[in-house]
Amino acid sequence: MEELDCEPAVTWIPGVNSKKKQMCFDWGPGEMLLCETSFNKTDKSEKVPSCPFIYIIRKDVDVYSQILRKLFNESHGIFVGLQRLEEELSGKSRKAQLVRVSKNYRSVIRACMEEMHQVAIAAKDPASGRQFSSQVSILSAMELIWNLCEILFIEVAPAGPLLLHLLDWVRLHVCEVDSLSADVLGSDHPSKHESFWNLVTVLVLQGRLDEARQMLSKEADASPSSAGMCRVLGDLMRTMPILSPGNTQTLTELELKWQHWREECERHLQDNTFAANPHLESLCKIMLGDEATLLEQKELMSNWYHFLVTRLLYSNPTVKPTDLHLYAQSSLDMFLGGESSPEPLDNILMAAFEFDIHQVIKECSIALSNWWFVAHLTDLLDHCRLLQSHNLYFGSNMREFLLLEYASGLFAHHSLWQLGVDYFDYCPELGRVSLELHIERIPLNTEQKALKVLRICEQRQMTEQVGSICKILAMKAVRNNRLGSALSWSIRAKDAAFATLVSDRFLRDYCERGCFSDLDLIDNLGPAMMLSDRLTFLGKYREFHRLYGEKRFGDAASLLLSLMTSQIAPRSFWMTLLTDALPLLEQKQVIFSAEQTYELMRCLEDLASRRPECGEPDAQRLQDDDIETTKVEMLRLALARNLARAIIREGSLEGS
Amino acid sequence: MLRREWHRKGLLQQTPFFHRPLKERHTLKTCESQTACEDSNTGGWKCSQENCVSLWSIGEFGNLDSDGGFEGDHQLLCDIRHHGDVMDLQFFDQERIVAASSTGCVTVFLHHPNNQTLSVSQQWPTAHYHTGPGSPSYSSAPCTGIVCDNPEIVTVGEDGRINLFRVDHKEAVRTIDNADSSTLHAVTFLRTPEIVTVNSIGQLKIWDFRQQGSEPCQILSLTGDRVPLHCVDRHPDQQHVVATGGQDGMLSIWDVRQGTMPVSLLKAHEAEMWEVHFHPSNPDHLFTCSEDGSLWHWDASTNAPEKSSLFHQGGRSTFLSHSSNQASVHLSLVSSWLSTDPAKDRIEITSLLPSRTLSVNSLDVLGPCLVCGTDAESIYVTRQLFS
């Protein structure tokens, strides 16, 4: 057992009196039921009225957020696409595809973030506004981390392009500059705007030198005295060698050019070219990567990773991935300057710069309130073949563990559970078992939902679950007096025992009411009739009635007899069958042959002789017995008369 | 071509088109003004607390940009809470919407265009219910299907009951208890006052409200294995032609005037077919959607081959021939759906959704517009069906 990385968080449930210590709880899929018990251990005589509430504690509250639901739904599509991609991917296109997938994930996070932002602005009460805003910042942090992981682990950018990616990363996430820029440019005299120099500095800090140059030219136009200096600095900005994607120059060439450029910058600084204008001098120092000057602009950079990237841009543009963590650590230390301690986000980013994937995932799992992020990121990194060697001391590997956790959370939701199915499908080791356990616990409030669940089970050959779901539905239908439905469900489940039970109900109803219900089903059973003997009997018995109704007495009679002789009819039903034979026996023409009549007589005697000896006779019992005896007598009489007629008829037919 | 119009997620900068309530079902309607602006109406599918019926506007025709794409002109007009899952949803008239609930309740919502709100204008709380030994008085049964024909509303449910309501009457005009021993899945008008219902044991029943009693006037059924039927639609011009979709994804075309078996059985989807619709003004075209996540366009108008070539750009394009089990000869006005000459008649099928993952639960079509809702909680809209 590993040690705990942090103390588990305590959740306070309002309304529960924890001092009384009478809690009981039960785990459900993804949630916990908690209630106060009515047991009072001190004295039983005085019943303190206990709290009448049951509390439901949900682990993944984020699943219930309306906006985040879109995140779950959209990312599900991307996830499934990625798993399918796996089969056809190889070699070079593989990386490009994985990067594309990663970008898709990020675009979904971004879209959710934007929508959440809109909602937060529109929120009427400040409390919910704050709540949405905090969600926005969480989503933004997720995207920040994901983007960095994409650059470092998926893109695996080499020295050179690495810095370009990091610059894009910072530009994307520190985006206040755009509104500032619009603000300044929108004013009448941009260069007189109070934030003008801030803007220019931020542009230089982010390496957006073209824009910075345009700004400087505005300053040059406005104040002719500094025009010369602005031109010199603008030229420096223009000539700064950068790696452009289409360029074929080697890193060494670039480094050489860069050194020359840097020396030129230094020369201007030593010559005090910009001494007259402290703003321009500071800009030049920034372009030389002067750490002290950079740290003066802390406010404008707002965070240490911006500082890191700016520092690298102007001091080591061809930084190797392996050296990154050294710069990162020192940048963090310098930026915080011992004044504050790093926050969870800082630790996560630092772990990423150290290329410690497991640490990134671990820290994210602790810091974030849901499993969405770690599950999807881990899965993607696993597809990059970065996690193969890591096995947990429980369950299977980390990817699967996280996916299972995430999918279980989804399954607790009344609507998102369908997404969970696909996640379970792509967990080779424990996914199937988990799915089996979860799918049986989905509340089936409509048949449509039940059909969806059944389809999922049938596609995966989960026969046991199919059976149990059909049984639940059949049971429900019986309880609602919907025998036809119940029978359909038990036929679908091929559940012979239940079909027998339902058939018995049908027969009992028939005995009570004297007519069949649900003829549309019973008349159309077809081969399904063979599912259980009782069902066969039900179908055949109904057929007998139909034949009788159509006045096909001969067929009806032989069917009736065969039902008894072949032992399909339950013995308890024989008396009814024999009573049904009465009108046939009393018909004008002879229907039962002598042989058939003998058979009927045998059945009747068989039944009469096996009548159970009753214990205490009561009035009701006696009356019943009386009716029964009369019936038997009538039958005997009818049989005897029919036998006589049959013998005469058969004899005369043969004789003639 | 077709695919591009699907309104959906893009890369980084594009905001995906998402939809709030779950598992939409919807219908389309034309607005009062003749500018042919459309509203699509959508509703939630799932559990109690969060479902709502929402009214969306998907913008006007004809203002597409050069790319054929649309951005941002679909808009949520209003929504209202709905108790229980929305099992079916239909426009009653220009401003009224009828919703079927899994609680057995049938509600008529009224849309107020002035202040863009929805309100309940009529409600039958216990339209569908079970009576059983387990329940003291009654327990609710989901209402599975509705069909409207002003001023009448017919509803069917899992309790096998058929209700005929009039929108201004508090009580049901006519109720047929135990109309079916199994679950009734869908209903449609054949010709007033006759309706067709389909049930979970593969039967198609025709009912005439002029007749008393609880017996259908005709039962048609699939052969043998009682595959449940989930949806039904009637040909808009030829009232004897009916299409149904079943649990096995088969599309059946029936001629209710003759025979008790379908005229043709067409192998279609791989799982439950949830909805089938003839195009209201162009009935040679048929649309089906399924649990397997596909949405298909069936085109039986291929007698003019040069016209059909327009549809070739779509993804899947297959030719199927009718498997006919009945030799019927109609010399005059033969519907393209009933003709049985396998050599001559072909149906061209185009798949309208690019990737198949989760179930497409519902669809509706009007003019060049088609709307469908999926289990991935999104709505797809295309406005160029025939281009």
From Swiss-Prot, chain A:
Sites of N-acetylmethionine modification: M1
Molecular-function annotations in GO: structural constituent of nuclear pore
GO CC annotation terms, alphabetical: cytoplasm; kinetochore; nuclear envelope; nuclear membrane; nuclear pore outer ring; spindle
Protein localization: Nucleus, Nuclear pore complex; Chromosome, Centromere, Kinetochore; Cytoplasm, Cytoskeleton, Spindle; Cytoplasm
Keywords: Acetylation, Centromere, Chromosome, Cytoplasm, Cytoskeleton, Kinetochore, Membrane, mRNA transport, Nuclear pore complex, Nucleus, Phosphoprotein, Protein transport, Translocation, Transport
Residues carrying N6-acetyllysine: K92
Phosphoserine: residues bearing it: S223
GO biological-process terms attached to the record: chemotaxis; lamellipodium assembly; macrophage chemotaxis; mRNA export from nucleus; nephron development; positive regulation of DNA-templated transcription; protein import into nucleus
Function as written in the Swiss-Prot or TrEMBL entry: Essential component of the nuclear pore complex (NPC) that seems to be required for NPC assembly and maintenance. As part of the NPC Nup107-160 subcomplex plays a role in RNA export and in tethering NUP96/Nup98 and NUP153 to the nucleus. The Nup107-160 complex seems to be required for spindle assembly during mitosis. NUP85 is required for membrane clustering of CCL2-activated CCR2. Seems to be involved in CCR2-mediated chemotaxis of monocytes and may link activated CCR2 to the phosphatidyl-inositol 3-kinase-Rac-lammellipodium protrusion cascade. Involved in nephrogenesis.
Oligomer status and interactors: Component of the nuclear pore complex (NPC). Component of the NPC Nup107-160 subcomplex, consisting of at least NUP107, NUP98/Nup96, NUP160, NUP133, NUP85, NUP37, NUP43 and SEC13. Interacts with NUP160, NUP133 and SEC13. Interacts with NUP37, NUP107 and NUP43. Interacts with CCR2.
Annotated family: Belongs to the nucleoporin Nup85 family.
Protein name: Nuclear pore complex protein Nup85
Gene from which this protein is expressed: Nup85
